[in-house]
Structure formats: C-alpha cells, structure tokens
Amino acid sequence: MAAQPQDREGGAQLAGPAAEADPLGRFTCPVCLEVYEKPVQVPCGHVFCSACLQECLKPKKPVCGVCRSTLAPGVRAVELERQIESTETSCHGCRKNFFLSKIRAHVATCSKYQNYIMEGVKATTKDASLQPRNVPNRYTFPCPYCPEKNFDQEGLVEHCKLVHSTDTKSVVCPICASMPWGDPNYRSANFIEHIQRRHQFSYDTFVDYDVDEEDMMNQVLQRSLLDQ
C-alpha cells in the first residue's frame, strides 16, 4: 500500500522525490536502518527505535544524530506505531503481503525469501567474477565526508568519530556498499551512529560472503557477543 507523508507527531517527514524513491523510508530508524521497533519521538521531532535511542543517550552530551540538537528522552510515537501495524509491504520471496510490524519475523523463516537473497548474492558473485576490476575493495575504505581514503574498517570508524561527529550530511556507507547485498546508492541519514553500531567489528573476521545478510548478521552478533 502506498505510504503518505507523515506529520511531525509521527516522525521525520519525507516529501517530493525522496518520498517517491523510498515510500517506506518514514518507517525506517535512521540509526539501525530497520523498521522501527517501539518507536520513540524525541523533543526535536525525530524518531528512533527505543533500543537505538538508549544507545544514543549514553554519551555525556548526547545529540540527535539527524539534526545534531541536544538529545533527551522522548515519548512513545503511538501514531507511528499504529501506522506500522496497519501498513503492508510484500515479501520479495513469496510475494505475500505482511504488515510492517510482522515482515521482519516473516523473512527470517521464509525459505523463498532466503532463496531470493541467495540468488542475488550468487548473481553479484558471478558478475564480479566476469568483471574482476569491479570487485569491491573490502579491506580499505574512503571517508564519505572528506577526500581522506585507505582506512581500514576500525580506522574509518575512529576517523569519522573524531573528525565528522557533527557532520549532518546524508552519505553512503562505504562498508555496507562493498558487501554483496549492499546498496551503493542508499544514503544513511545518521551515518555516525550507523557506523558505530553496525561496524565496530571486522567483517573479514566474521563474514562468509557466500551467505545472505540475515544469516551473516546473526553469525556476527553471536560471535561478537562471545568475544566480549
């Protein structure tokens, strides 16, 4: 079903080309880039998953990752939560429709969705083998904010934290873009929080590039917890 621009009480509003290109973007947390879970609206009007917000509030002087204003505990985004419960999207595997609140649990067990992901990964691998010059470099990365480059993953995280912590520009994550499932055109609205939450570990240590992203993330989370 088509998604309509939401008001300030529902969360960050998309309009124009951005809304048309990503009609479900208003249901996506700018930190974890997943459909909101227990969405909470903070005083500046932006919305985060409850768990993501708790992480963002940990620094001594927390700021909103979207607008960089002072961050404070928010209130439950009841209207947005209602819309997530009532808005449908389709599974790319079985093509059945599900409410946004149910789609994440569904794709975790849908064999057709797993096949869809594997076909995409295999196609990417096949194309890369035919065009070796286009194989992404997964060892060093450029900074998406400035001309600096040749960072390893940990170096890029540290550089962005030290140099670009107040930069509000939406940028493409070079680490995600290098993955077989990565979208080189997807711009994170909150790259600093994203890179700190999703890329504190080394993909080369944990990742089997022959599996899909869902399985990969589960493996990474399990192994990273064991290493703590």
Curated annotation (Swiss-Prot):
The UniProt PTM text for this protein says:
Autoubiquitinated. Polyubiquitinated in the presence of E2 enzymes UBE2D1, UBE2D2 and UBE2D3, but only monoubiquitinated in the presence of UBE2E1.
Outline the subunit composition: Interacts with XAF1, the interaction increases XAF1 stability and proapoptotic effects, and may regulate IFN signaling.
Gene name, please? Answer: RNF114
Q: Which reaction does it catalyse?
A: S-ubiquitinyl-[E2 ubiquitin-conjugating enzyme]-L-cysteine + [acceptor protein]-L-lysine = [E2 ubiquitin-conjugating enzyme]-L-cysteine + N(6)-ubiquitinyl-[acceptor protein]-L-lysine
Zinc finger feature spans (C2HC RNF-type): 91-110
Positions annotated to bind Zn(2+): C91, C94, H106, C110
Name assigned to this protein: E3 ubiquitin-protein ligase RNF114
Q: Which GO terms describe its molecular function?
A: ubiquitin protein ligase activity; zinc ion binding
What Pfam families does this protein map onto?
Answer: zf-Di19, zf-RING_UBOX, zf_C2HC_14
Keyword Protein biosynthesis among record annotations: no
Q: What class of enzyme is it?
A: transferase
